[in-house]
């Protein structure tokens, strides 16, 4: 029994050590996905505006404002995630962009829907545990704590 308890403890220590690299990987993955989407929107802005006017059904706000806000979120929030700056807020923001994207598509294919679920799930640890030790958040916390 003592062997199992020690093994469990050592495994916990290893996983604690790997938490920050795992959070970094999560931040980089989510940032890459959303930043690429934002660049696509910027690259063909006229088409982006048409999509927001006729394809996406963003609730409450006008289509043009939704296009600007969504694109800004897809460009700015990933940069914050890469550097681990305001990681929890950036994770929440990315999650909101993700949720609005799913809600605004009336006929989202199952594969695309599943990808949005994955991106949301990957963002959750960032929201709950922050950016980790490999981040500007950790640097600033040490400096100003």
Regions flagged by a language model, labelled:
Residues 43, 47-51:
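A glycine-rich, hydrophobic loop/mini-helix early in the fold
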């Amino acid at each position: 029994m003592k062997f199992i308890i020690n093994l469990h403890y050592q495994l916990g220590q290893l996983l604690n050590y790997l938490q920050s690299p795992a959070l970094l990987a999560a931040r980089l993955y989510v940032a890459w996905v959303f930043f690429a989407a934002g660049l696509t929107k910027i690259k063909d802005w006229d088409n982006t505006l048409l999509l927001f006017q006729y394809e996406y059904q963003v609730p409450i706000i006008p289509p043009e404002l939704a296009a600007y806000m969504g694109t800004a979120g897809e460009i700015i929030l990933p940069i914050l995630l890469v550097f681990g700056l305001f990681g929890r807020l950036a994770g929440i923001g990315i999650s909101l962009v993700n949720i609005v994207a799913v809600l605004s598509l009336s006929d989202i294919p199952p594969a695309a829907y599943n990808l949005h679920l994955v991106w949301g799930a990957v963002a959750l640890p960032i929201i709950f545990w922050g950016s980790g030790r490999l981040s500007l958040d950790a640097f600033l916390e040490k400096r100003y704590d």
